[in-house]
């Protein structure tokens, strides 16, 4: 569960290391985001020659949460930390590589590019 002020690691090669959620998109009073939800983030830590700079604001999709996601068969998939992939204004990934596993819940038409770039789909 991701909410405002939550810090997430970045699971792509855009140059951002850590981002902070500043808004959960999808409804005026929406408080929490889970895997597959789009959030508005600001870059808190970035590499020197990366594609993004500290302080810039982007859309991002949550790909891993410590809270996890419950499947229809009753199983629960949890991760060690929270991670997101940065998106542009058209909701396409900015990076060209994805690091770490992602879940099957991202397999919608909107995020098939992320699933295809990921090294492992759980």
UniProtKB/Swiss-Prot annotation:
GO cellular component term, pick one: cytosolic large ribosomal subunit
Function per UniProt: Binds to 23S rRNA. Forms part of two intersubunit bridges in the 70S ribosome.
UniProt keyword Methyltransferase present: no
Keywords tagged on the record: Ribonucleoprotein, Ribosomal protein, RNA-binding, rRNA-binding
Family label: Belongs to the universal ribosomal protein uL14 family.
HAMAP family: Ribosomal_uL14 (MF_01367)
Leader peptide range in chain numbering: none
UniProt-recorded name of the protein: Large ribosomal subunit protein uL14
Molecular function terms from GO: large ribosomal subunit rRNA binding; structural constituent of ribosome
Biological process annotations from GO: translation
Pfam families: Ribosomal_L14
The protein's assembly and partners: Part of the 50S ribosomal subunit. Forms a cluster with proteins L3 and L19. In the 70S ribosome, L14 and L19 interact and together make contacts with the 16S rRNA in bridges B5 and B8.
